[in-house]
Amino acid sequence: MYSMEQVVNLAKHRGFVFPGSEIYGGLANTWDYGPLGIELKNNVKKAWWKKFIQESPYNVGLDAAILMNPKTWIASGHVGNFNDPMIDCKKCKARHRADKLIEDALDAKGIEMVVDGLTFDQMADLMKEHEVKCPDCSSEEFTEIRQFNLMFKTFQGVTESSTNEIFLRPETAQGIFVNFKNVQRSMRKKLPFGIGQIGKSFRNEITPGNFTFRTREFEQMELEFFCKPGEDLEWFAFWRETCKNWLLSLGMTEESMRLRDHGEEELSHYSNATTDIEFKFPFGWGELWGVASRTDFDLKRHMEHSNEDFNYIDPQTNERYVPYCIEPSLGADRVTLAFLCDAYEEEQLENDSRTVLRFHPALAPYKAAILPLSKKLSEGATEVFAELAKDFMVDFDETGSIGKRYRRQDEIGTPFCITYDFDSVEDKAVTVRDRDTMEQVRMPISELKGFLEKKIQF
């Protein structure tokens, strides 16, 4: 089994992810996506948009503003209730999220337990019972558990006063809810229908960590799917299965994921069903996707605070009701990291070894690499590159032996290496090498585009 350290080292060495502000000593838990990382992440986002917006007869897209009227967050409950349980170590002054500290301590003992949803007293009792220690200094002396609001606060305009106070959004969902009527009317949508968007969110996490898994600045891919009350659990099951199948269609293995239903004590007060799709990272199981039936909570809250009517009139029955909502919420950074971890392999060959990223071709940063066998063949190889680059991200590499170039492309997940050799000048054909099998076939240059188009389908 590979370690998280191996994945992080490859990510930096090969230009997937760099530490943020590195030349100034960095900024804790900030990361910059490098040339290959942004291609991978963009491909993940494109694949999500294709499945959940483009190919869906129900759903449309939106791009709501990051900065919203502060009343939005009062209505949604974020100002009063968007908190994590915080605790400080009395000895080393390290600050921790109490529920995660307890879960990690229990996990080390082989005890699986969800602490989220317990009272502070119950958490404190668990800490004493299991002698939970500070991971930084091993002390068992902690302050009392207290609430910590996760929203980033800033000011709009030239003066810093409470009247100009605004927040960086902690989720993209509220931008969808406040635009429910705008979208429904302008697009003439009838229930059921959904609104999806991809965008940045910000949470002042107490203990971010595990590379890009938990960061204070992150990107979400969220769908809010509105339906008639009473049909919500049917749609909940539909979207839960659709989400799982999307991951499988892009090469994630069944063994590396699990669906975990929330028990009654863990459910949010507004939810009647929630399932987390979790991935087995090298550091343990972590949530990728939360699929929740949110009932009519959000639309009703915004109705109360804005005096806007979000009732829907059914054109067939003339019934009037506030729609229920199913929310599949996916972290773009988390699922990108999951695909990177799932693809990573160190393979032992007969007389050699190689590191390979077995990405689905749809996700791979480069779909192919053009490799002239000799620099004397660069002109012809460049023509092949130029033609394919109109439709695909392709690499061009003429440095080093062909074997070393193959290994470099394996390590960044390029599914196909296209070698332009001396015969190519005459027969207008190239050798195509498959990353996973390492098998090679001869193919006319004229067929390359169709070949790659077929391979990147999912």
From Swiss-Prot:
Name the catalysed reactions: tRNA(Gly) + glycine + ATP = glycyl-tRNA(Gly) + AMP + diphosphate
**Where does the UniProt annotation locate this protein?**
Cytoplasm
Q: What is its EC number?
A: 6.1.1.14
- Positions binding substrate in this chain are R97, E171, F218, E219, Q220, M221, E222, E327, P328, S329, L330, G331
Report the top EC class in one word. Answer: ligase
For this UniProt entry, which segments traverse the membrane? none
**What Gene Ontology molecular function terms does this protein carry?**
ATP binding; catalytic activity, acting on a protein; glycine-tRNA ligase activity; protein dimerization activity; transferase activity
Q: Which SUPFAM superfamilies match?
A: Class II aaRS ABD-related, Class II aaRS and biotin synthetases
UniProt record, GO biological process? glycyl-tRNA aminoacylation
Where do the annotations place ATP binding?
203-205, 213-218, 287-288, 331-334
Pfam families, per the entry: HGTP_anticodon (PF03129), tRNA-synt_2b (PF00587)
The UniProt entry, under InterPro entries, shows: aa-tRNA-synt_IIb (IPR002314), aa-tRNA-synth_II (IPR006195), aa-tRNA-synth_II/BPL/LPL (IPR045864), Anticodon-bd (IPR004154), Anticodon-bd_dom_sf (IPR036621), Gly-tRNA_synthase/POLG2 (IPR027031), Gly_tRNA_ligase_bac (IPR022961), GlyRS-like_core (IPR033731)
User: Where are the coiled-coil regions?
Assistant: none
Q: What are the record keywords, sorted?
A: Aminoacyl-tRNA synthetase, ATP-binding, Cytoplasm, Ligase, Nucleotide-binding, Protein biosynthesis
Look up the record and report any one GO term of the cellular component aspect. cytoplasm
**What does it do?**
Catalyzes the attachment of glycine to tRNA(Gly).
Which PANTHER family is this protein grouped with?
DNA POLYMERASE SUBUNIT GAMMA-2, MITOCHONDRIAL (PTHR10745:SF8), GLYCYL-TRNA SYNTHETASE/DNA POLYMERASE SUBUNIT GAMMA-2 (PTHR10745)
Q: How does it assemble?
A: Homodimer.
The record's comment on protein family reads:
Belongs to the class-II aminoacyl-tRNA synthetase family.
This protein's name? Glycine--tRNA ligase
Q: Which gene encodes it?
A: glyQS
